[in-house]
Amino acid sequence: MKEIVIGIFAAFFFGFTFIFNHSMELDGGSWLWSASLRYFFMVPFLIAIVWMRGGFKRLTEEVTRAPRLWLRWSFVGFVLFYAPLTFAAASGPGWLVSGTWQFTIVAGVLLAPLFLASSGIRHKVPLTSLAISGIILVGIVLIQIPQANSASLQMVMLGILPVIIAAFAYPLGNRKMMDVCGGRLDTFERVLGMTIASMPAWIIMDIWAVVTVGLPSSSQVFQSLLVAISSGVIATTLFFIATDRARHNQGKLAAVEATQSTEVLFVIVGEMLLLGVVMPTSLALVGVGIIIIGMLLHSYHTMIATKKMHLTIPN
């Protein structure tokens, strides 16, 4: 249950990504800067945290042990996650992006066969977790229906396809890096290592931005800083703490990743308060209720599975 609570707190801070990205898009800011600035701003905060915790030596040893793996899975987990997400925010409405992002719930469950258990056998797709994730996804679809009716097909596709890529990339990169680190690094060290390893891609993106759209506005820089603190540092760290704690149980791990569905609730409220977005329709509110039910079912399933596991462990 602790992992579920941590995941929900992470979702709250992740929600600011969609709100501020929507705000920057409305102000005319480029998605290229919105994506790269977040990770540049994350570096000094993470360096300070890791330095105070004395983790630089461990991090350096891990990165030098497998630099190609760090570059590869950091690119997948951070670049292929956040660049498509910010592109979608510039191409579609915020509700569509935050709603479609919840596909990561199902993606996280479907990725299980790509990983080996401690016994060397590949994990199976946890069917109960998949079924519960499907319930949450139904709620997400209901939230989208009223708004999708008023959006063009091109806007819908530009808002959906990049986010589906991000929905698979984020849990895949996260889990692969957990395998690479093998529990030898704490969450802050792993996030810093992945952030630094993804820097070449962000630098290339910055060069592209300077050539095509010029420098970012002061408003976009400030909002990107807020995204870096709330989503990049606080939310990412909380989420990785939760997934680290659950990484040996695919059902529990899927439940933690499913907590990200609550982002939709936080984004709806946040956009209403900060951006003046109208209140969702009754059908959308039904979808919100289904999401909450799905979350409760995930939490209950996790609690029961944990109790059974403890009962089967000999004293």
Language model features with spans:
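Glycine-/small-residue-enriched transmembrane alpha-helix faces in small-molecule transporters
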Residues: M1-L37, A131-G134, V138, N149-D179, ...
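Helix-helix packing/entry segments at the starts of transmembrane helices
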Residues: A11, L37, L96-T104, V180-S198, ...
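Specific transmembrane alpha-helical segments of multi-pass solute transporters/efflux pumps
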Residues: F13, G55-W101, L142, S230-R247
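Juxtamembrane C-cap of transmembrane helices in multi-pass membrane transport proteins
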Residues: F13-G29, S34, A83-G92, T100, ...
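Hydrophobic/aromatic residues within transmembrane alpha-helices
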Residues: M24, S34, F87-A89, L114-I121, ...
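Transmembrane alpha-helices of multi-pass small-molecule transport proteins
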Residues: G29-L80, A107-A112, I135, F168-G173, ...
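C-terminal-most transmembrane helix of multi-pass membrane proteins
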Residues: Y39, S119, L253-N315
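Hydrophobic transmembrane alpha-helices of multi-pass small-molecule transport proteins
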Residues: L46, P113, K124-Q147, T281-T302
